Regions:
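Compact, charge-rich alpha-helical regulatory domains located at protein termini
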Residues: 1-71
Length: 71
């Protein structure tokens, strides 16, 4: 997956709300590659809402990336 051309791009490129982006950055997740190493449950523990996690997951899939443990 690390060969994906989006792996080193910033999470800001995701079409998600500002609250979700702020939460990711507060947890020092700044790149899509870093984000893809997290599980949904870990994102929820950071304070992200389920609908925000679902949106993040869809956005990653559109770029050929997934969250850890996702198919």
């Amino acid at each position: 997956m690390e060969n994906n051309k989006y792996f080193k791009q910033f999470v800001d490129r995701l079409d998600v709300n500002q609250n979700a982006l702020d939460t990711l950055k507060e947890n020092e997740i700044t790149t899509l590659g870093q984000l893809s190493k997290y599980k949904k449950t870990q994102l929820k523990d950071m304070g992200l809402l389920q609908n925000e996690i679902n949106k993040i997951e869809v956005e990653l899939e559109l770029l050929g990336l997934t969250l850890k443990g996702s198919l």
